[in-house]
């Protein structure tokens, strides 16, 4: 790969991780990449369109971006939260994170189209602003969105505060919006970086029908398995209300110390209730792919749960619909069904920064 073009004077842990995954995928070859928990032979996969970032054209001052975590807003639109974003290219001008765009798309099969930006003053600007102010400096390297959820008329965004370098988590925190994501306020809740032995840094969540929000958590370094928490939906801002699921005295129970419910090397995750089931999608850093599980409940035995590979990693210049170079993310777009799933998937060509974008994938036939 070519010499790195850095976005700051500090090292890029995410770049190192993605480069490692790409090398591993190339070294394993097609046979290893195909040895996932379940082959995706029954799936129909379509690369729909690049939504934002490189290869999408500049929209709302966004020329390079990743993640695109989607949520349904209280007013019925879609909101997509993005991570590190620049006006032109990685390491370029107007670095900000998180930013968010709106979509009124109702037919996902036609492709998501953005029609507005979130953030204070966004409706009077042509540039999507950082959702809240902080300086990208020696203390706050950057703040990355982890997941977004809507509970009633309020939205919550979990964010990962990095510093002094990317991948070193100072803490994570909870923000809220009462105007469908137009403006955001800090709830006052900060989660310690070492909560659950570092397994509550990158999280995903879904609202159950029992009054609880269920949360899978892992580290931000792609070297840990996942733990499970729950919190009453009306107590989101109270740290003491977050209950771990753990194994002790011969059994699993809420309130036991958090125990990994599945080992591995987890990256970005997306947990959602869908079609009477629960679905978890995640970037499997160990296998260089995006996997999925369909569950009856988040407390299912994940060791024995069926797992399906949705997308494999691949090499630049040798991609197809199911083999995607330097992929990560894999977030479920509202409006999906288990049999017709739409995901936002990120790519970053860490060798030359020519690709740093979010793409929409359609996956049919999972169930």
Describe the residue ranges of each PLM region.
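Short, well-ordered alpha-helical packing segments
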Residues: 22, 67-71, 175
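Beta-propeller and closely related beta-sheet repeat lectin domains
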Residues: 66-69, 142-147, 200-204, 267-270, ...
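Beta-rich carbohydrate-recognition and catalytic domains
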Residues: 41-60, 72-141, 150-195, 210, ...
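N-terminal secretory signal peptides
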Residues: 1-12, 21-31, 36-39
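Short glycine-biased active-site loop of nucleotidyltransferases that positions the nucleotide triphosphate
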Residues: 324
């Amino acid at each position: 790969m070519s010499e790195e073009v850095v976005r700051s004077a500090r090292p890029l842990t995410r770049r190192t991780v993605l480069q490692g995954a790409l090398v591993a995928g190339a070294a394993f070859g097609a046979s290893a990449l195909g040895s996932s928990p379940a082959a995706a032979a029954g799936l129909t996969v379509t690369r729909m369109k690049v939504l934002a970032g490189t290869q999408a054209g500049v929209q709302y001052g966004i020329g390079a971006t990743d993640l695109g975590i989607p949520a349904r807003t209280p007013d019925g639109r879609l909101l997509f939260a993005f991570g590190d974003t620049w006006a032109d290219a990685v390491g370029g001008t107007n670095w900000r994170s998180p930013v968010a765009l709106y979509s009124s798309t109702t037919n996902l099969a036609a492709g998501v189209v953005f029609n507005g930006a979130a953030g204070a003053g966004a409706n009077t600007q042509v540039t999507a602003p950082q959702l809240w102010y902080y300086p990208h400096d020696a203390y706050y390297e950057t703040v990355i969105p982890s997941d977004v959820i809507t509970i009633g008329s309020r939205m919550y965004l979990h964010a990962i505060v990095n510093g002094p370098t990317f991948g070193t988590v100072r803490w994570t925190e909870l923000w809220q919006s009462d105007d469908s994501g137009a403006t955001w306020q800090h709830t006052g809740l900060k989660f310690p970086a070492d909560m659950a032995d570092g397994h509550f840094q990158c999280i995903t969540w879904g609202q159950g029908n029992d009054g609880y929000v269920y949360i899978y958590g892992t580290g931000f370094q792609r070297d840990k398995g996942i733990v499970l928490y729950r919190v009453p939906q009306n107590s989101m801002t109270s740290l003491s209300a977050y209950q771990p699921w753990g194994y002790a005295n011969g059994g699993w129970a809420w309130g036991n110390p958090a125990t990994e419910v599945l080992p591995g090397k987890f990256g970005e995750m997306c947990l959602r209730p869908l079609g009477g089931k629960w679905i978890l999608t995640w970037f499997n850093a160990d296998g260089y792919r995006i996997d999925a599980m369909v569950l009856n409940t988040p407390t299912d035995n994940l060791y024995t749960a069926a797992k399906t590979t949705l997308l494999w990693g691949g090499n630049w210049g040798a991609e197809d619909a199911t083999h995607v170079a330097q992929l990560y993310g894999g977030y479920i777009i509202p409006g999906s069904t288990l049999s017709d799933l739409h995901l936002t998937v990120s790519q970053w060509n860490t060798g030359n920064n020519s690709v740093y974008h979010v793409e929409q994938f359609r996956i049919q036939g999972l169930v």
